[in-house]
């Protein structure tokens, strides 16, 4: 009996084949809408005095920063073809070098995090300098963390629809049509194929093997699980504004770091720290570290710094308010 699952033949990157509207693009639209609605609902629920037009300006900067940051990180850090260095305008255009429409398929969330902080910081210190958006900025980051994590899984489902970001070889896994095939002469390949019921014919030089659906695992833990932890646990123990955002960054980085062990390293990059070169299907090492894991460690440390800094800001406000009350 076959011990693998074939990728659904009816599933395609486009919502309707032949029409350039992709699940990936729709996932971003829905995540933005969910975040916009949720954050505004929280503002109204907590009776925070922020004008709608100021909030929309803030959200525009946040979305723009996230997209630019994610796009820059994907094209300049992960892509090693050199196409974006020789044709930098392609970074911000939904076309390839031959002007075929592709949409914005390459995004890296680590860069998105950075852009989603830098762009709003710029706008609240310029256009929104004298508004309550600046006053409640840290509170808004907390709202945004819960909002984004609630819709995050949509992006990973879109990755699955694209048959991309799949995991390593596993019995009972899914045979992704776009996965890189293995040379049948690689040690362990024929034995593995035979053990799961895949037939290798004498003339077959390459074979596609089942993979871990790591994009779905990432989506589950970095999305719903993280969101529930933020909402039901950390929201209740929150002592100051900015705390939840810092915790969210650390939670995301924590889950991402360990789930990366299940994920196939990026083809162009491989392992950044290649302690033990992999020569067969059965070999594995926790000391082989990918780019995603390195960036996740940086992100985790950044989240910790955010928690510490925002705690000091909160303590300073309490001290100033106490001194003011004492003087009065």
Curated annotation (Swiss-Prot):
Keyword line: Cell inner membrane, Cell membrane, Membrane, Transferase, Transmembrane, Transmembrane helix
Zinc is among the record's keywords? no
Pathways involved? Protein modification; lipoprotein biosynthesis (diacylglyceryl transfer)
User: Is Glycosyltransferase among the key words of this record?
Assistant: no
Q: What's the chief localization of this chain?
A: membrane
Q: What is its EC number?
A: 2.5.1.145
What name has this protein been given in UniProt?
Answer: Phosphatidylglycerol--prolipoprotein diacylglyceryl transferase
Gene from which the chain derives: lgt
């Amino acid at each position: 009996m076959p011990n693998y699952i074939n990728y659904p033949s009816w599933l395609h990157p486009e919502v309707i084949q032949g029409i350039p509207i992709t699940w990936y693009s729709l996932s971003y639209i829905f995540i933005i809408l969910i975040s916009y609605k949720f954050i505004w609902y929280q503002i109204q629920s907590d009776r925070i005095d922020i004008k709608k037009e100021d909030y929309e300006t803030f959200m525009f900067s946040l979305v723009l920063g996230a997209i630019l940051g994610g796009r820059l990180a994907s094209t300049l850090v992960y892509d090693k073809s050199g196409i974006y260095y020789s044709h930098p305008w392609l970074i911000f255009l939904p076309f390839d070098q031959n002007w075929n429409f592709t949409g914005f398929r390459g995004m890296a969330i680590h860069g998105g995090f950075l852009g989603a902080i830098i762009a709003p910081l710029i706008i609240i210190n310029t256009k929104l300098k004298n508004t309550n958006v600046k006053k409640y900025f840290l509170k808004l980051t907390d709202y945004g963390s819960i909002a984004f994590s609630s819709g995050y899984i949509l992006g990973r489902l879109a990755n699955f629809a694209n048959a991309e970001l799949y995991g390593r070889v596993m019995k009972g896994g899914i045979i992704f049509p776009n996965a890189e095939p293995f040379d049948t002469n690689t040690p362990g390949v024929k034995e593995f194929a035979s053990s799961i019921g895949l037939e290798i014919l004498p003339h077959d030089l390459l074979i596609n093997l089942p993979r871990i659906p790591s994009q779905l695992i990432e989506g589950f833990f970095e999305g719903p699980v993280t969101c529930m932890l933020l909402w039901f646990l950390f929201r209740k123990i929150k002592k100051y504004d900015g705390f939840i955002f810092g915790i969210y960054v650390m939670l995301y980085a924590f889950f991402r770091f360990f789930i990366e062990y299940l994920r196939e390293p990026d083809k162009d990059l491989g392992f950044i720290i290649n302690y033990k070169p992999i020569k067969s299907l059965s070999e594995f090492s926790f000391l082989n570290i990918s780019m995603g894991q390195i960036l996740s460690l940086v992100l985790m440390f950044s989240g910790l710094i955010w928690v510490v800094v925002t705690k000091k800001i909160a303590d300073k406000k309490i001290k100033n308010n106490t001194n003011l009350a004492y003087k009065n």
